[in-house]
């Protein structure tokens, strides 16, 4: 099922087969439609739509920079549907922000024109709502490299409870030490009572950018990285693979979306790819696994 053979039935694919040009991609499934967002435009945050994950259409700007706190560096958007509203967590000018809309296509607007943390540069903010309804934000702080932290949010899903800020991950494993000191792009899910955090290490510019996993039994406790990390690095013909997020597809299958370099010689424009996530029971504990196989989404008119 990880091929684009079906796409020929649904649309005429260009002979050149244009990839979807998103870095730091995120996919939202809402009302039977897949929406993809990511880093690409200097005008804000773009979106693309698909019915089958294989062929995608450009939709325009979901967030225009006029509606944001900043006017440059629009990175790593993640969109969540909560209580009838769509919340976009994204970075702008190396600060973390939230914009809200009534539709997944926008317009997303940042009513309060200020970042979530005004006095500190941060990036890669990701929402996680626990079973009891408590919202959390994982994000990257720039202290001795890029490190992943977590904090509780107020019920407005925008205000960080600063007193709860807790460190999760920093560079510790050998595979992460290619260049420079980077743990970033976190995404948290809960499975059978365990919290799983996927994250990326090394610079996104490095061919050795890759995805690892860490687990915890308490979000505010100790996060333990897998010894077998990275779970994804240079799959198939891809290099520079990372900044991932997970989602459940229409068939109920857990998927992972990530970007890779344009090719082995050029980083940009980065392109979006989609793999599968599974859990393997090892000594009574479910271990996350990421497929080496991947879908190559195609852009159609």
Feature names for model-found ranges:
Residues 2-301:
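Carbohydrate-active catalytic/glycan-binding domains of CAZyme proteins
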């Amino acid at each position: 099922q990880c091929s684009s053979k079906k796409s020929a039935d649904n649309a005429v694919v260009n002979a050149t087969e244009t990839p979807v040009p998103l870095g730091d991609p995120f996919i939202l499934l809402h009302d039977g439609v897949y929406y993809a967002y990511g880093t690409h435009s200097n005008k804000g945050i773009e979106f693309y739509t698909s019915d089958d994950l294989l062929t995608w259409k450009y939709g325009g700007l979901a967030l225009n920079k006029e509606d944001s706190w900043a006017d440059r560096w629009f990175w790593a958007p993640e969109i969540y549907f909560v209580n009838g509203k769509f919340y976009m967590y994204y970075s702008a000018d190396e600060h973390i922000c939230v914009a809200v809309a009534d539709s997944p296509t926008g317009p997303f607007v940042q009513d309060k024109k200020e970042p979530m943390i005004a006095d500190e540069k941060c990036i890669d903010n990701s929402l996680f709502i626990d079973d009891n309804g408590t919202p959390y934000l994982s994000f990257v702080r720039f202290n001795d490299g890029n490190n992943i932290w977590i904090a509780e949010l107020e019920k407005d899903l925008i205000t960080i409870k600063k007193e709860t800020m807790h460190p999760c991950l920093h560079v510790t494993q050998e595979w992460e030490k290619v260049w420079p000191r980077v743990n970033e792009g976190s995404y948290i899910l809960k499975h059978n009572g365990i919290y799983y955090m996927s994250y990326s290490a090394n610079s996104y510019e490095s061919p050795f950018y890759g995805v690892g996993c860490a687990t915890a039994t308490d979000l505010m406790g100790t996060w333990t990285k897998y010894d077998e990390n990275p779970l994804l690095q240079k799959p198939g013909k891809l290099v520079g693979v990372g900044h991932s997020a997970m989602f459940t597809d229409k068939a109920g299958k857990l998927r992972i979306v990530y970007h890779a370099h344009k090719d082995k010689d050029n980083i940009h424009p980065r392109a979006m790819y989609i793999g599968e996530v599974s859990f393997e029971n090892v000594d009574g504990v479910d271990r996350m696994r990421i497929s080496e196989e991947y879908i190559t989404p195609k852009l159609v008119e």
